[in-house]
Amino acid sequence: LASLKEVTGNIVIRNSYNGADLTGLDNIVSAGGLQVGSTDVASKATELHMISMKALETLSGDISVYNDQVTYVLFEKLATIEGSVMFNASSLQSFEFPVLTTVGQDLNLQGLNEENTAAGSIASLEIPELTSVGGALSVNNLAKLTSMSFLKLKETGGLDFHTVPVMLETINLPEIETVNGSIIMEANMEAPPTGSFVPQRNDVLQAFGGMDKLTTIKGQIKIKNFTALKQLPDWSKITTLGSITLDYLEDVSGTLLLPNARFETFGETAPQIEIINKVQLSKIE
């Protein structure tokens, strides 16, 4: 395989594969896709700990990895993925795409284990050059995650962070302008600490990094279970929006400013502002 530079179809890693990494594929520059396991049956390649293709620059299809043993993910030169990215890796420690700029469809990173609970030990997630995701950007069920940064992301089909860990401290999206779907940021609820009857929510994230360049959200904004959040982002540039739901944001107060927002119906999202539990906003303008 050492001389192989291009694969037009999918590279499929079978259960019988017993390597620790994908060293034999290190000279491939372009491929149709990469598949390790599936949504129906996770990969049983029990020795596979590293997913990496050192020379790979473009994929015309998808990356899909479903494997409980994969610990490290590194694609040093991969800049464009025309299809989707799906990783469900409950042992994940590191996830690196240092030059990736474009994903044509969904980018979905999960850490569900066999018990269907959040797992993985990755603490920090950053895709530094990512500017566009055609589908939804989803990061969920990573139990130890404390920081997420997408510093150049400008447009995506949605932001789906619906299982944010209670200890997540940072979500950075300083350049995001257009979301052609919904923004869901919801922290987990965990069992009450000893001596308390109140479920534990995220009590460390105090502010979102950025989101003040947002102009278009073709769906809802939902922010829930961030009890230490001091203020909402500056949404004064938003011109198009479906709805807003705010819930269990105990430290948020003051005025919700949406001076330029025009509410529209997108699919099943009806135009509304919904303030539910423990939000201390005094007025909406």
What is each model feature region?
Residues 7-72, 77-93, 99, 104-124, ...:
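Concave beta-strand-loop units of leucine-rich repeat
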